[in-house]
């Protein structure tokens, strides 16, 4: 397995539109950080550059998914508030964080702590 940047070569988060797309990405990458967000969430929008920087610094796949696009995601990941960050290692969710805006250094430490 490998981590891969988005197809356009940027470090912007990969936009996922379904549970199947999320599962495929998690199966394909060693480590994946997913932000669950909703349209109109200002904090969620402000996290995008932080996530892009994190992808570059940690060589990790970073994605965003709106659970409203695929409602079973809400139940599967117990999404109660956004942004919700879920870290996957080898396809399995290993940690979750739902603390609003998370500064880059804090999010980087959290990813390192939970991904070995």
List PLM regions with ranges:
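Typically the conserved alpha-helix immediately C-terminal to a functionally engaged Cys/Sec
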Residues: 43-58
């Amino acid at each position: 397995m490998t981590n891969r940047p988005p197809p356009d070569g940027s470090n912007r988060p990969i936009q996922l539109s379904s549970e199947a797309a999320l599962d495929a990405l998690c199966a394909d990458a060693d480590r994946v950080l997913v932000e669950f967000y909703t349209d109109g969430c200002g904090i969620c929008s402000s996290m995008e550059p932080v996530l892009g920087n994190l992808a570059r610094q940690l060589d990790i796949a970073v994605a965003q998914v709106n659970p409203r696009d695929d409602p079973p995601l809400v139940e599967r990941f117990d999404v109660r508030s956004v942004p919700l960050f879920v870290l996957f290692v080898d396809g399995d969710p290993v940690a979750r964080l739902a603390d609003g805006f998370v500064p880059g250094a804090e999010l980087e430490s959290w990813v390192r702590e939970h991904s070995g």
